[in-house]
Amino acid sequence: VGFFNALSNPQYAIVEDDSYRQRKIETNPLTNYNILVLNQSLKNNSSISLINTNVWRSGKTYDANVTAALFDFNDKKNRWNYGGEIASSNIFNTGQNEKTITGFSSKLYFGKSSGRFTFKINQSLSNDKYNTRDMGYFTFNNFLDDSVYMGYNWLKPTNWYNKLFLNFNSFYSRQLDPSRYRSAAVNVNANTQLKNLWNAGAMVGYEPEYNDFNEPRVEGRFFRGWKSAYGNLWVEKKKKKKYKANINLFYLNRSL
């Protein structure tokens, strides 16, 4: 169990009009912030949690509350993993009618977390009314994101390497309402430790043109971004030697 509470005093500013007349205005009212966290550890490194954040402001301005339930489960061998998050945001006393705006967000994932072959499938969703900016980091809402990770590793040493890792990543994003393409990306990575304990790796990736619906800040418009193809090669000298060296080559091609 965790609980945090903080209180901030009202804040004021002196403003002056064109006639040099000054007046004192309230820029931020008396405000109370609190966070409540309930967490229960379960067998097999599993857990469930409930988090609630609340911001109360005195006077006629709005108040905000966000509640989220999280869960993460593993099987007995810690080989398979699934979990997620369901959250709801409420902004109270907004507008002339003092209505409540309720938003919704969810996240679900499933994967294999041990063994030579591993993978993870993830989906995140947020409607256009979900808002956590009163207490927390907030970028944007109204999206549906899907991602897939697949990896394969060779941990048994051979004649030329000690270990080798290969992974594939893909990402696809849409605006939820109205449903429109936002962005996508795909890349493949390989990393290895050689017999002389040097490390080396390579990566190739591609991102098609994307649509940024937030950048124009004008309803009905969007920013069309470029498509990108890129690659990376790197070699790192053995770290335990007196001198360390790292060579990194990166290629990027962008076009509209």
Regions found by a protein language model. Give the residues of each.
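A conserved hydrophobic secondary-structure block that centers on an alpha-helix together
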Residues: 1-66
